Design a protein with these regions (language model features):
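A cytosolic small-molecule/anion-sensing beta-strand core signal
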Residues: 44, 60, 79
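Histidine-centered metal-chelating micro-motifs
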Residues: 29-30, 49, 65, 69-74, ...
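Ligand-binding loop in jelly-roll beta-barrel domains
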Residues: 71-93
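Generic protein-terminus/edge-of-domain signal
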Residues: 1-47
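A generic beta-sheet turn/junction motif
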Residues: 36, 52-54, 79-81
Length: 107
């Protein structure tokens, strides 16, 4: 975490949750970075790949992935994509009560 940039988006806003809407071109790849708030990444359009030290997650359209506060990560995609993020204060009362790891699922 300390070796990568700190993205401080929304930290100056005195609210428990801050929202960000983003549009990215095909081939986008962020630098590795981290946030003081937890980040819920929602793929509105396109497919997003989120990579951390713990692994990589493919987030298809209309799905989301949770990135806990202060976890170094990178966001990228081969195609253009639209993304919404909720940045949630790193406070025990705002953390998910429980969650499960991603698993393969057939429909």
């Amino acid at each position: 975490m300390q070796s990568s940039p700190h993205d401080s988006y929304g930290e100056e806003i005195d609210r428990p949750v801050v929202v960000r809407a983003s549009e990215y071109p095909a081939g986008y790849s962020s630098d590795h970075h981290w946030h003081a708030r937890g980040q819920l990444v929602y793929a509105c359009d396109g497919v997003v790949k989120v990579t951390t030290e713990q692994g990589a997650w493919i987030v298809p359209q209309h799905r989301a992935v949770w990135i806990p506060a202060k976890i170094e990560h990178q966001i990228e995609s081969a195609g253009a994509f639209s993304m919404r993020s909720l940045y949630i204060q790193d406070n025990p009362k705002f953390k998910p009560v429980s969650y499960t790891h991603l698993r393969a699922h057939e429909t």
